[in-house]
Amino acid sequence: MKNMLSAFCLAGTALLCSCILPCEAAAAETAQTIKMNMKARIPALDKLKAQGAIGEANTGLLAVLKDPLSAEDAKTVDAENADRTKIYTAIAKQQGTTVKLVGERRARQIHELAPKGTFLQDEKGNWNRK
């Protein structure tokens, strides 16, 4: 299941980057960079999720559940959230909706595919382990 979620995230990122972000040369390079960076972060993020240090928030972003994270781990989480926000912003612009709504939709997808043991935030803000 963990590999399925990772594969889903990669496939979703690839689709979002290739279809939603503008196709100009600079934007395409940025989309490719985002995709590569997100792929590279998967092992570190999976480890932090398995430890219960981070969870998937109802906003479509990661949340720190156990402070303090190491500086390196905090940087990884911040970078992932920044890239997710860029993708959600591009989708919102393309669909004429809000970044918040795109993130919430993505959170529901992530929650469905998250492996057992992942901390997930429900719509009311409560944290539960799947």
What does each model-identified segment do?
Residues 28-75, 79-82, 93-130:
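Amphipathic, charged alpha-helical segments and their helix-to-coil junctions
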Residues 15-25:
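C-terminal segment of classical bacterial N-terminal signal peptides
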Residues 1-12:
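Bacterial N-terminal signal peptides that target proteins for export
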Residues 12-13, 118:
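Alpha-helical transmembrane segments and their juxtamembrane interfaces
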Residues 88-89:
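Contiguous, amphipathic alpha-helical segments that mediate oligomerization or scaffolding
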